[in-house]
């Protein structure tokens, strides 16, 4: 397909890591991660394979993305983005999700991601527990107060 069909957005921005990126709505991000993870396209499958076989090169050795891809043995592909964005795809299933923390921070997006992945059945109970211990911990200065919306596309 022509480039304009794949990438209808023309405004370029820079992510936190400096990589050029397009401004797009969350439903488009989720759709793109579903396509990325689907296995229907050889080029995208190669990207997913590279990400899941070497997750530490995606975001560093101790990052959420690396831990999710490593602990799920490559069944989930994950990439954190700037301003509270988190995109995740179920490898081989053609399913994707995108999360946006309204305040632009990481505080909630990882906890939301772990919760959604558990609810969707994308994580085993053991992996879910391990990720929850690290990313869903409340302290005396934190509370679980749900704010925002959840839309399924």
Model-inferred region functions:
Residues 4, 25, 109:
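Hydrophobic (often cysteine-bearing) scaffold residues that line and stabilize catalytic clefts
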Residues 7-8, 25, 124:
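General structural signal for secondary-structure boundaries
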Residues 14-25, 39, 43:
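Short, contiguous, pocket-lining structural segments
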Residues 34-153:
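Structured C-terminal helix/loop/strand segments within mature extracytoplasmic catalytic/sensor domains
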